[in-house]
Amino acid sequence: NFEEDPRVLLRTRLENSAGEMASDNLALNDVVLHKWLTARMIEFELWINGRFVESQRSDGIIISTPTGSTAYALSGGGPLVYPDLDAILLGPICPHALSNRPIMVSGSSTIELRLCGRTTANDVRVTCDGQTTLEMAADSRLLISKAEHPARLLHPAGHDHFKVLRNKLDWGGRRQ
């Protein structure tokens, strides 16, 4: 016997300056905008639901699903999020300002990233689940939102998410 476990997928669209779709990808864990072939920070604007949030100088940003909260996002200082929560996590990678902290937004949100400042296309890459790498032109936009359909995982009957966390994160067992 198996139990179905629907999980949020992220849809990542890269649009060029004319608004045409240059790339369309899915990610189960995370989408990462990160520096590439440079030792200096990158600079980008973060928009959520069409509203400007901030310009950030950092080594990048991790946009994660609740499933991905136990992966790269956790290593970057993000929270563990229960997998059936309808949320998207945003975690800066080595931000220049100590005020840049991880945040969590509604799963219905649309995240938009735009390069700014001296950051050029040669300075950054976008990686989806550590597998697909995209080049981002300086005048393009990266749009990240929840995919229309979830991933459907199957677990053996009686699956216990917290048991998985105890094993994966080496949490102590229950004291008798």
Predicted regions and their residues:
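A generic structural signal for well-ordered coil/turn residues at beta-strand boundaries
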Residues: 6-8, 27, 40-42, 57-59, ...
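ATP/nucleoside-binding phosphotransfer catalytic cores, i.e., glycine-rich phosphate-binding loops
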Residues: 33, 49-52, 101-176
